[in-house]
UniProtKB/Swiss-Prot annotation:
Reaction catalysis annotation: N(6)-dimethylallyladenosine(37) in tRNA + (sulfur carrier)-SH + AH2 + 2 S-adenosyl-L-methionine = 2-methylsulfanyl-N(6)-dimethylallyladenosine(37) in tRNA + (sulfur carrier)-H + 5'-deoxyadenosine + L-methionine + A + S-adenosyl-L-homocysteine + 2 H(+)
Annotated keywords: 4Fe-4S, Cytoplasm, Iron, Iron-sulfur, Metal-binding, S-adenosyl-L-methionine, Transferase, tRNA processing
Organism per entry: Rhizorhabdus wittichii (strain DSM 6014 / CCUG 31198 / JCM 15750 / NBRC 105917 / EY 4224 / RW1) (Sphingomonas wittichii)
Domain Radical SAM core: 153-385
Annotated residues for binding of [4Fe-4S] cluster 2: C167, C171, C174
The protein's Enzyme Commission number: 2.8.4.3
SUPFAM superfamilies for the chain: Radical SAM enzymes
UniProt-recorded name of the protein: tRNA-2-methylthio-N(6)-dimethylallyladenosine synthase
Family that this chain belongs to: Belongs to the methylthiotransferase family. MiaB subfamily.
Amino acid sequence: MGRGMSRPAPKSFHVKSFGCQMNVYDGARMAELLEAQGMHAADSADAADLVVLNTCHIREKAAEKVYSDIGRIVKKAADAEEGRARPMIAVAGCVAQAEGPEIPRRAPAVDIVVGPQAYHNLPQLVADAAEGRRALDTDMPAASKFDTLPKRRRQGPTAFLTVQEGCDKFCTYCVVPYTRGAEISRPWGAIVDEAKALVDAGAREITLLGQNVNAWTGEDDRGRTQGLDGLIRALDALPGLARIRYTTSHPNDMSDGLIAAHGEVAKLMPFLHLPVQAGSDRILKAMNRSHDAAGYLRLIERVRAARPDIAVSGDFIVGFPGETDEDFEATLAIVRAVDHAQAFSFKYSPRPGTPAASMDGQVAPAVMDERLQRLQALLNEQQHRFNLATVGKRCEVLIERDGKKPGQRIGKSPWLQSVIVEDGPAIGTLVTVDIVSAGPNSLSGALVEQKAA
């Protein structure tokens, strides 16, 4: 990086995104930026002139994976036939933001480093790298990238739409405030316009994204202050849009209006991802979560009162510093009390620069492993039970992709379960199915009737 050697400008690219849905959104927008420059997408990194690794920094394993990928790309290029130049390598995303100039020092093959708030400058960085100039940008200007991104042009039946970025909660284990910055909300009009463009491009379902999405706030087209519920109600009126979802939420920002929207907005799907992280009040306080277990359970009760069939999802961390057996049992207790449709569990991963990384009482890896296995077994049991409870129900399924067998399609239920449907309904259509069987990770449905797209 920055060695002064020029190289041909890339004609093809491949974007590989790690981690959260927002990275998937960012990866798609980077691809659109590069296509707007005349490049075409390659099917794999091996076939691309430019490889963009859109990285995640939330856990050590995810952050380290980027370096193994860089090594693999370099080795494959070295082993390839003569005349095939090594692809240009760009590291984007949260590892880029956190490590910046350290990345090319550790991995000299990296040509470009670009943070998650600066990727709108990727075309210029590619041009700089091709000319042998330094190509690093980890600035965090508030929301300016959205003003320069190209209009959404083509889209599958489901789409992500970032409405909010950053986080001000400063949970003691989390790097997001340092890699994504302070909370910012995109303007109402920009979100509505992008949603319209996504629908025009083929989207039937839109998932609103944010690190703390239910903290979104802004003024509507009449100058009135709105929260996420107001934005959802506006999108509910868009012709052609069939489904709305949002993720990820913080318990402290579940407003009365947002809870009410779950019972009142027809297009808002009955699914809520609301992480609690732990069931012990002592651990929640050490995490700086700003809520307790009882308050979280009251929120779940209120949401279920508004929408009785809602599926609840969550995130859990085991082995946070100082976690005792009693604390872990409190986590199992809150899991049993909520009864999740699905959830994600992780071993605590100390991230440099976060308060938790230097806390006393770091839990032994073997203890974390045992706790994770117990927790995941309980969550798997709950997910399978939730799936079995849908057998015999009739629901709409949005067909998203081909299945493994000829004529088979896979779609999503309102509760975000994968549903396998035979008889080949077209991708992008809403079909009514009877759920006839359920496994731990998917359902099978019998086609009843089909709605026009």
